[in-house]
Amino acid sequence: MDVCLSSAQQPGRRGEGLSSPGGWLEAEKKGAPQKDSTGGVLEESNKIEPSLHSLQKFVPTDYASYTQEHYRFAGKEIVIQESIESYGAVVWPGAMALCQYLEEHAEELNFQDAKILEIGAGPGLVSIVASILGAQVTATDLPDVLGNLQYNLLKNTLQCTAHLPEVKELVWGEDLDKNFPKSAFYYDYVLASDVVYHHYFLDKLLTTMVYLSQPGTVLLWANKFRFSTDYEFLDKFKQVFDTTLLAEYPESSVKLFKGILKWD
């Protein structure tokens, strides 16, 4: 089995508690040589280390408990640290569906060196899969989610992906021009999963989706449809994006859409 994990901490049983994300990141940044499964020092560690030192360290939320859950996509075993204490620390059905689609359509999507931003990345599964497929990924979410997100990204991509994912704060609809100026940031794909549910920020979410979409940008959005407000959002989405239903997953009530921003 091909496992894409840092040797700093090997995966344990499903549901086994893990150490603090911040503590693991600090240990990685001290420069201890990385070893392969035979105990040999990896030659690539010197190339990765400068990137680690340049990372912004996000302080993890101190949830009472974490569990680790095992997934397999793109030929890799992926271990995600999750907590049921936060919506943003759990892998939801839309993320699973989107990962499945990315895996099954990898050749068509051609993520190799593509610039990708994920909205509402949560614990990071979708961003990890996109990174494994070769993309340059920026994973975004609210501040309290970023510590665990960064932990999972580094844990599953360090030394086994072409590009180390970046983590950035993104509050929907706020400071977009300042934090993501169009002159400096262009994305081939914008990814989102289960970002639409019963909350009060749907208009700001749509504003953010529109802002991040430039000519040539493809938005892939997977969502479990639970409430009437989900369909109301979809109607608004279709007004500003040329929308294609790419896949449906009846067992989980997830629909996956492709959106291209309308420019006329």
Swiss-Prot record:
GO terms for molecular function: heat shock protein binding; protein methyltransferase activity; protein-lysine N-methyltransferase activity. It is found in: Nucleus; Cytoplasm. Keywords: Cytoplasm, Methyltransferase, Nucleus, S-adenosyl-L-methionine, Transferase. Transmembrane segments: none annotated. Residues 1-46 are annotated as: Disordered. The keyword Kinase does not apply. Residues 1-10 have a biased composition (Polar residues). It catalyses: L-lysyl-[protein] + S-adenosyl-L-methionine = N(6)-methyl-L-lysyl-[protein] + S-adenosyl-L-homocysteine + H(+); N(6)-methyl-L-lysyl-[protein] + S-adenosyl-L-methionine = N(6),N(6)-dimethyl-L-lysyl-[protein] + S-adenosyl-L-homocysteine + H(+); N(6),N(6)-dimethyl-L-lysyl-[protein] + S-adenosyl-L-methionine = N(6),N(6),N(6)-trimethyl-L-lysyl-[protein] + S-adenosyl-L-homocysteine + H(+). Gene3D superfamilies: Vaccinia Virus protein VP39 (3.40.50.150). GO terms for cellular component: cytoplasm; nucleus; protein-containing complex. Its main location: nucleus. Its EC number is 2.1.1.-. Protein-lysine N-methyltransferase using S-adenosyl-L-methionine as methyl donor. Mono-di and trimethylates 'Lys-943' of AARS1. Belongs to the methyltransferase superfamily. METTL21 family. This is Protein-lysine methyltransferase METTL21C. It comes from Homo sapiens. The lineage of its organism: Eukaryota, Metazoa, Chordata, Craniata, Vertebrata.
